[in-house]
């Protein structure tokens, strides 16, 4: 059986931490920021982590060698 390929789109969007969690950057912080509240923009600066259900799918299907 051939080796599985890592999905390059997923590799660009997700990174795996040392503890095995999958980290990603939150959306909605690129442009049209004037109508967004400062509190919302502040919360969007922090990284997001996948839930356990999503974690299994992403690690198995998209990032097999992570």
Swiss-Prot record:
- According to UniProt, the name of this protein is Large ribosomal subunit protein bL35
Name the PROSITE patterns for this protein: RIBOSOMAL_L35 (PS00936)
Alphabetical list of NCBIfam families matching this protein: rpmI_bact (TIGR00001)
The gene name on file is: rpmI
* Entries under Gene3D superfamilies matching the protein: 4.10.410.60
Query: Which family is annotated?
Result: Belongs to the bacterial ribosomal protein bL35 family.
The answer on whether this UniProt entry bears the keyword Glycosyltransferase reads: no
| One GO process term, biological-process aspect | translation
Gene Ontology molecular function terms on file: structural constituent of ribosome
Origin superkingdom: Bacteria
Upper classification of the organism: Bacteria, Pseudomonadati, Spirochaetota, Spirochaetia, Spirochaetales
Q: Which InterPro entries match?
A: Ribosomal_bL35 (IPR001706), Ribosomal_bL35-like (IPR021137), Ribosomal_bL35_CS (IPR018265), Ribosomal_bL35_sf (IPR037229)
List the keywords (alphabetical).
Ribonucleoprotein, Ribosomal protein
Signal peptide start and end residues: none
Q: Which Pfam family is one of this chain's hits?
A: Ribosomal_L35p
One GO cellular component term noted in the UniProt record for this chain: cytosolic large ribosomal subunit
- SUPFAM superfamilies, per database record: L35p-like
Record-linked PANTHER family: 54S RIBOSOMAL PROTEIN BL35M, LARGE RIBOSOMAL SUBUNIT PROTEIN BL35M
